[in-house]
């Protein structure tokens, strides 16, 4: 009798194992094959963009150039070339981390945001994420060098609320789950 119970336990265990394997295998076979999950991400950082509209060949601007390592004169051309490269690469996501502007000049943020929006229109489905850096908000060094008398003046600084409004096309996107 013991042999029969032992054989019955073996048979029951084998039957349960077959049922278990079958029930787990069928859904796995019926599931869709995994999609190609390649995600192309472009990252840009420390743009230090300075609008050409704020540049004038004055003594104050020359002093600023000689006092700073940022490529103020070249920043617009560099940014243009980088955006052309992004257009050619057609990434799914563009992450632009601060410092976005020279020193948080609101006019520079507005000009950059306009270019980013154009880039987003040129690349269907492109998600753009923008993160401010220490140069981008409440910076007292914001300057405009293109003045009537050739003297640099304080440019309009960007406050956190301004930043969010300027880059509204980013922060109104429901995929952005947290802001400031």
Question: Where is each model-derived feature located?
Answer:
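Extended active-site neighborhood of metal-dependent phosphoesterases/phosphodiesterases
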Residues: 111-180
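Residue-level detector of short, conserved catalytic/binding motifs and their immediate flanks
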Residues: 18, 39-42, 126
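Bacterial N-terminal signal peptides that target proteins for export
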Residues: 2-15
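N-terminal active-site segment of His-dependent metallophosphoesterases
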Residues: 30-109
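Active-site micro-motifs of SAM-dependent methyltransferase domains
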Residues: 22, 49, 102, 136-137
């Amino acid at each position: 009798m013991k042999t029969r119970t032992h054989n019955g336990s073996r048979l029951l265990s084998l039957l349960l194992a077959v049922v278990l394997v079958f029930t787990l295998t069928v859904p796995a076979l019926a599931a869709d094959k995994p999609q190609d999950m390649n995600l192309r991400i472009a990252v840009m950082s420390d743009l230090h963009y300075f609008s050409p509209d704020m540049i004038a060949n004055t003594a104050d601007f020359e002093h600023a150039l000689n006092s700073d390592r940022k490529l103020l004169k070249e920043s617009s051309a560099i940014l243009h070339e980088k955006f052309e490269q992004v257009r050619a690469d057609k990434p799914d996501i563009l992450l632009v981390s601060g410092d976005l502007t020279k020193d948080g000049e609101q006019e520079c943020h507005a000009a950059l945001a306009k270019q980013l929006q154009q880039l987003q229109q040129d690349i269907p489905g492109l998600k753009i994420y923008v993160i401010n850096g220490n140069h981008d908000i409440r910076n007292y060094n914001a300057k405009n060098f293109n003045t009537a008398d050739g003297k640099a003046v304080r440019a309009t600084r960007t406050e956190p609320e301004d930043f969010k409004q300027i880059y509204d096309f980013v922060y109104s996107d429901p995929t952005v789950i947290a802001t400031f």
